[in-house]
């Protein structure tokens, strides 16, 4: 029921509080004013991935960003039970570590403006997540302590926030249809919720949880390379 309250508040903010054109960066010449133009806008969100390959790459990076989040929630409770971490402790870890993610979403936005969006995504997002996703998984092996596992999980959540500048970087890659570029990122965010559990389902028997985690670490390194390729050197 609380989620319904949050969704309602978000709808009010989007539809009434923030409806003024001069406060919306994506409203202007591209604003749809009829049913036909709205349909064209929808098609442009799909066509831009073909017309602007860098936007497609940015969308793939967005998928990789939170893939581990949706994979971990599937198998980490089962994995940690082997080390004596029960469901209650796991729920406490999972709920607590994302408080750090919320805080660092803001911090990495500021960091990105100072050192560059691309650099922030590459080093904190890509490389940082590759290291921290492994550290979180191997935490009970290194030191089977609740607080140590929580700290490693918090570091992973902090590094997830390193992808925050992607929301600014991808629209900046196109001269027009910036709204369509943002929609590609939204699509990537949604796909991550599907891709994460899919990876676990496909590879659990073949390579086990260890193989899955190393595979995800490889995906993060790949996302760092992809971001480096699409990001302008001054961003």
What is the meaning of each model-derived region?
Residues 14-30, 229-235:
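Helix-loop junctions on the cytosolic side of multi-pass membrane transporters
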Residues 86-94, 145, 178, 182:
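Juxtamembrane helix-start elements in MFS-like secondary transporters
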Residues 105-117, 204:
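Helix-to-loop junctions at the C-terminal end of transmembrane segments
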Residues 174-209, 216:
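A late C-terminal transmembrane helix in Major Facilitator Superfamily
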Residues 53-105:
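Extracytoplasmic gate region of multi-pass secondary transporters
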Residues 21-59:
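Juxtamembrane intracellular "pre-TM" segments in multi-pass secondary transporters
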């Amino acid at each position: 029921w609380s989620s319904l309250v949050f969704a309602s508040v978000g709808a009010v903010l989007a539809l009434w509080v923030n409806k003024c054109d001069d406060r919306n960066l994506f409203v202007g010449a591209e604003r749809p004013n009829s049913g036909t133009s709205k349909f064209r806008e929808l098609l442009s969100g799909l066509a831009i991935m073909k017309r602007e390959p860098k936007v497609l790459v940015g969308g793939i990076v967005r998928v990789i960003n939170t893939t581990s989040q949706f994979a971990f929630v599937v198998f980490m409770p089962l994995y940690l039970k082997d080390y004596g971490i029960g469901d209650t402790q796991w729920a406490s870890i999972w709920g607590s570590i994302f408080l750090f993610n919320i805080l660092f979403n803001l911090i990495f936005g500021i960091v990105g403006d100072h050192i560059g969006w691309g650099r922030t995504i590459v080093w904190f997002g890509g490389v940082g997540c590759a290291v921290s996703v492994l550290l979180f998984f191997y935490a009970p092996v290194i030191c089977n302590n609740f607080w140590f596992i929580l700290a490693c999980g918090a570091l992973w959540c902090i590094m997830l926030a390193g992808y925050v500048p992607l929301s600014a970087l991808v629209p900046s890659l196109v001269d027009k249809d910036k709204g369509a570029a943002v929609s590609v990122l939204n699509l990537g965010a949604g796909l991550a919720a599907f891709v994460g559990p899919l990876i676990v389902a496909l590879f659990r028997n073949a390579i086990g949880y260890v193989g899955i985690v190393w595979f995800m670490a490889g995906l993060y390194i790949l996302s760092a390379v992809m971001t480096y390729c699409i990001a302008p050197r001054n961003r």
